[in-house]
């Protein structure tokens, strides 16, 4: 399931910003020290409309690219809040069976979940007046910072953190999960048999969030030309680095090239995969299972056309990079850059390099029809939690992927419309021999934020689970495609 940190952050954001939804949540406690005011970020474009772009730190602050390189002004406090988040849930059930001979079997079960957290938070913001003063007093550093030069050469856009939601003191999160079960039976006859049993299991988890941790942030785009500026009102047409006249066409092509979904639509049309009436515009706008399936199917068809030996090489090495986050990020960055620029890509080491070798020509240029689906897959895998990635790496060594795929597909199909809460019954044929918290498929779904139950197997759908569940479906679909034997 989502971490205790993630769940609390989402609830606090909902209370502080309401329905505006423009605060970007920090995804883990490890990253809660990274997104400070004035911090510079790179935005990784999403390969699908079903998951959002991701921001990553470039290890620079605004002062690192300006002169004089003095500390930035302190951000101003625009409100302090005390938020308490307490959840207490209980599910109970009982069943009794009796036969003609008066034999009886009865049983009961109860599951309870509770969590609590109380925190003092504040909003810190860099005001427009502060930005104007800094622009007047500081100019771009010369020579240009080396990291900035690399980002310029790649044509990446840069963003600066302008506002944060920060804890004022240490926060303790407590989660308790309890299960109880009991059963009785009576079997009459020459030898009357009776039995009774009870069981109880409780799990408690405590997480401490240090004072000064960043829970969420807002960004503005940084503009760099002969002078620097901050774009406080978003404009998707603007680029961070002002292109020279000879580069304007290339930059424009790069911006449009970032829409990998359009490339996948093109692949699908070439192979007549979208003959069910979904054209490109509908595919981009349709937020339903049919749209998700069309995206993923366009990718898988290209992968299935590869020779079995190449597919196995890719699959084996994906299993390795799932356990090596830096390698996975390096491969995703390399493919993204190559797909956007259309030029050669630099070789990579290790399992990421082995995958890249399968996707390039002898000249070192990417084959877009092969690179785009793998880029899409990496984007889906990146949405998943570390626990899910580890489980998928293990599943690649078994034959359970297809059943896991069918179950996730069933959940997505039966939970529409996705914008509403619902309960979805799970077919026992897809659950395996043991359906409980230790089942890998259970954990995969639970990590998406879905609540599951053992008795009368069900999934309780939450709209907030759409992004991770869609990414899980896409990951399972494409990994299964790579493992399929040719027809």
Curated annotation (Swiss-Prot):
The keyword Secreted applies. The modification S-(2-succinyl)cysteine is found at residues 39, 57, 77, 122, 192, 265, 299, 434, 487. GO terms for cellular component: cytosol; extracellular space; mitochondrial membrane; NLRP3 inflammasome complex; nucleoplasm; plasma membrane. Changing residue 154 to A: Complete loss of homooligomerization, lipid-binding, relocalization of Gasdermin-D, N-terminal to the plasma membrane and pyroptosis, as well as loss of bactericidal activity. Partial loss of homooligomerization and pyroptosis. The record marks 88-89, 276-277, 310-311 as: Cleavage. The keyword rRNA-binding does not apply. The modification Phosphotyrosine is found at residue 38. Changing residue 249 to A: No effect on pyroptosis. GO terms for biological process: defense response to Gram-negative bacterium; defense response to Gram-positive bacterium; innate immune response; pore complex assembly; positive regulation of inflammatory response; positive regulation of interleukin-1 beta production; protein homooligomerization; protein secretion. Changing residue 39 to A: Loss of oligomerization of Gasdermin-D, N-terminal. Belongs to the gasdermin family. This is Gasdermin-D. The gene is Gsdmd.
């Amino acid at each position: 399931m989502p971490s205790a940190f993630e769940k609390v952050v989402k609830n606090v954001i909902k209370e502080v910003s309401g329905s505006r939804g423009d605060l970007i949540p920090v995804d883990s406690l490890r990253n809660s020290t990274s997104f400070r005011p004035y911090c510079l970020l790179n935005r990784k474009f999403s390969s699908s409309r079903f998951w959002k772009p991701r921001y990553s730190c470039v290890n620079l602050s605004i002062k690192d690219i300006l002169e004089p390189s003095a500390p930035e002004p302190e951000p101003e406090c625009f409100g302090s809040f005390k938020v308490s988040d307490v959840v207490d849930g209980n599910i109970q059930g009982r069943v009794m069976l009796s036969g003609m001979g008066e034999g009886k079997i009865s049983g009961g079960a109860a599951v309870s979940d509770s969590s609590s957290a109380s925190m003092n938070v504040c909003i810190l913001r860099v005001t427009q007046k502060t930005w104007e003063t800094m622009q007047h007093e500081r100019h771009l550093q010369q020579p240009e910072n080396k990291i900035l030069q690399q980002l310029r050469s790649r044509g990446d856009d840069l963003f600066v953190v302008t506002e944060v939601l920060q804890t004022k003191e240490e926060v303790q999160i407590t989660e308790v999960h309890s299960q109880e079960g009991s059963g009785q039976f009576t079997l009459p006859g020459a030898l009357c048999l009776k039995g009774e049993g009870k069981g109880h299991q409780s799990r408690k988890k405590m997480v401490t969030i240090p004072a000064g941790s960043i829970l969420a942030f807002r960004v503005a785009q940084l503009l760099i030309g002969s002078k620097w500026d901050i774009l406080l009102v978003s404009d998707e047409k603007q680029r961070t680095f002002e292109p020279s006249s000879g580069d304007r066409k290339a930059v424009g092509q790069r911006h449009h090239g970032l829409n990998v979904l359009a490339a996948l639509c093109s692949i699908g049309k070439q192979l007549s995969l979208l003959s069910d009436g979904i054209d490109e515009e509908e595919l981009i706008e349709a937020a339903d299972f049919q749209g998700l399936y069309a995206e993923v199917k366009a990718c898988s068809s290209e992968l299935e056309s590869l020779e079995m030996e190449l597919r196995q090489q890719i699959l084996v090495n994906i299993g390795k990079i799932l356990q090596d986050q830096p390698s996975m990020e390096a491969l995703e960055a390399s493919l993204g850059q190559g797909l956007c620029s259309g030029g050669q890509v630099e070789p990579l080491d290790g399992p990421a390099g082995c995958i890249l070798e399968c996707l390039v020509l002898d000249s070192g240029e990417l084959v877009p029809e092969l690179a785009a689906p793998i880029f899409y897959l990496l984007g889906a895998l990146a949405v998943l939690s570390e626990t899910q990635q580890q489980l998928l790496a293990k599943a690649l060594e078994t034959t359970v992927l297809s059943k896991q795929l069918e179950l996730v597909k069933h959940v997505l199909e039966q939970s529409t419309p996705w914008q509403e809460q619902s309960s979805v019954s799970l077919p026992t044929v897809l659950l395996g021999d043991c359906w409980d918290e230790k089942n890998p498929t259970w954990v995969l779904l639970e990590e998406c934020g879905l609540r599951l139950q053992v008795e009368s197997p069900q999934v309780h759908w939450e709209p907030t689970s759409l992004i991770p569940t869609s990414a899980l479906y896409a990951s399972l679909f494409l990994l299964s495609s790579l493992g399929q034997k040719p027809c």
